[in-house]
Amino acid sequence: MRSLLLLSLLLLAPTASASALAQEKSAPKSFAQLTRGLQKLDGYFPLYYDAEQGKLLLEISRFDTEVLYQVSLPTGVGSNPLGLDRGQLGNGYVVRFERAGPKVLMVASNYRFRALTEDAAERRAVEESFARSVLWGFKVEASEGARVLVDATGFFLRDAHGVADRLRESNQGQYKLDESRSALYMPRTKAFPKNTEVEATLTFAGEGTPGALVRETVPAPQSVTVREHHSLVELPDNNYTPRRLDPRVGVFAVEFYDYASPFNEGLEKRWIVRHRLQKRDPSAAVSEPVKPIVYYVDGGTPEPIRSALVEGASWWADAFEAAGFRNAFQVKILPEGADPMDVRYNMINWVHRSTRGWAYGSSVTDPRTGEVIKGVVTLDSQRIRQDSLIGTGLVPVYGDARRGSGSTPECEFGASPDADYLAQLDPSADPARMSLARIRQLSAHETGHTLGLAHNFAASTYGRASVMDYPAPLVEIKDGRLDLSNAYAVGVGAYDKFAIRYAYTEFPRGADERAALDKLVDEGVRAGMLFISDDDARPAGAAHPLANLWDNGPDPVASLRHEMNVRRIALAQFGLGNVPRGTPLSMLESKFLPLYLHHRYQLQAAVKSVGGLYYTYAVKTDGGTSPADVQQIVPAARQREALAAVLDTLKVEELAVPPRVLALLPPRAFGYEGGTQELFAKRTSPAFDPITAATVSADLAVSALLEPNRAARLMQFHALDTSYPDFSEVLAELVTRTWRTPAPPSAPYHAAVQRAVQTLVVTRLMDLAADADASAQVRAVATAHLRALLEDTAPTSRDEATEMHRRATREEIERFLARPAEPRKRTPPPPAPPGDPIGAGRQTP
């Protein structure tokens, strides 16, 4: 019996030991156990880094407290079309951490729908009516009182910025995050009292053949490695007062639906986007701020560009002074060791790409109020090189009649000339000085966006009134020579001060802010502060004659004639003096392209008077409207003047590249086949193709005049008042200028250019006649003019080339007119707004 008992005890002992071990393993570990030996980063959300395991633990104690979660991209891919640039902001959310048993959920609030009321039940009704988004679920690893510890490694090692999606959408291939080649990036992982910053190196592995953009910029295109950044930031306190949007002033806004609004008022609320700025002395007309707005310029910017960025951005100090703040806006160089991704720093980043691209001004904004938390400017280093390219194409600084055709170049701007160099040159003929003037303006422009200001594309028509316009270089003609000394304005303009005053003026305590703002805006409107933004300037069929990109002057038509004169002078002197010694002559083409198309944007401005409409973003006031002029059709005489100026650009002598210049444009030199140069397309490769170049230039005018919306407006305005030109008149003038005006008989080359333009006109007419999106009346008029062109293509006794061209064109028109009809489908009428009081989009059962 004793032996049996002993045996039983021996058999049970291992089982008991294993059970105890299992209980020990399953027992939750404490904070101390999990964090022992780990690197702690104490801050807003404390972090614990396990270097051996490559893990990052996140301590959460701020439950049910809203924080800002912001994603960004510290390192880019380097291709402008991809849109994955260094310093780029990604998605931002207001989130809260919610404990749910063994999990912690990160939940994004939905501030697009809210109720501005003290009634908690009313607020809750709105919150529960619209979905929230759970961004992540964390497993609780340890809990101690009100704080928990979660393993956040997976959260931070994910593609939060959507890089793989962007690569796929850009047709660069299928990429997936490769965890084996991804890791936390601890040099940029930090914790501060009001924000916690985490960065990760992520590698995306490609499947199949990578796209061209990736192949051009990534050393091993199957492996795209970037870094993504995560910020958890304390939201601002409740001492900020939102300010309403006024459509007459171009300030961005956050828009939301307020379901606590009275039922007889609109749901939509719009609060402008701006930094918080308060006077130290509210009673003073001009006061120091409680806390200034400080921007930091990327230390990686070379001189003299760095100083130009500081100077240009600093112009905004004058606007804030006009709004009652002294020393409220400052620009500094980012201190050594400071993290540009830290939300405490408003940044002006200097970004490199393989090709030139847009600059951006964006902001981290509190979606609850519109308050700017961090401004982020992205400036492309290729932009200044493009400005230099334009300038050295206009002016032969590397040797001309004034300096001697073989003179040694003073500067190649890519070498970044210093101030001593700039002092030696005549500013009237110095592209480098012009380029730096442009980069100052660009710095001010993009910084203006981060201060809350939208584009104002009308400001160039009343005295260079805003850096928020897109300025073309103002090239003046003095004594028959081109003068670049006044190419770009210095400082912010009158409209900029007006907009900053609206956004930032602090009114005395007890003042009626709404009335004060209305007065401020009314005064600005009476002073001529016209604001017209992107949606009314960018479309090809835009109607407002004064809302234009890259234009100059109060009269777009006169400015077009001026730019054509500038182009003629520059073409007459274009040659060896436009490139430095030792440069292959084939490189001249990259400078010739912007010169040949120098007039393109001013042409786009002038053509808007044809079928054009002046209008404002007027609002109703006690006395009527402000501005008083709501809209007006462009006078008939003005429309015809603009049409004539636009058609003048189609003259053969304007389109034909001078033979002297053609002789200087050989095929690409050996070793220079690639690169970032932008060149004309060719049907004569490798030789330069002047006929295609002429077609490209002519199409600027032809396509603009045949734009379907412009054509429909012409017909509508003529129906209202027959004194206005109708679309048929415009087409008749276009056909007369291109088909019924003989080319100069001096050269077959000119006749070839004219034939190319004639073919273009017929092609664009056929495109319009077949455009299902164009109105039926517009298509009918286009078709009628195609029929009329059959007479212009009838056989004549002209030269053989002309006869072949006419015969081919006639046959092309006949084939088009006789084309088989497509299967008839019911043409839906333009959609009417929902009429049922219960809404639209779903049918009730």
Regions from the language model: what does each represent?
Residues 23-301, 319, 333-430, 439, ...:
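Auxiliary tRNA-acceptor-end handling modules of aminoacyl-tRNA synthetases
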Residues 314-325, 353, 448-449, 453, ...:
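Sec-exported extracytoplasmic/periplasmic mature domains
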Residues 6-15:
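Bacterial N-terminal signal peptides
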Residues 65, 300-328:
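Zn2+-dependent metallopeptidase catalytic core
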Residues 429-430, 460-845:
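Conserved catalytic/binding loops enriched for acidic/polar residues
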Residues 333-352, 437-492:
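The catalytic-center signature of Zn2+-dependent metalloproteases
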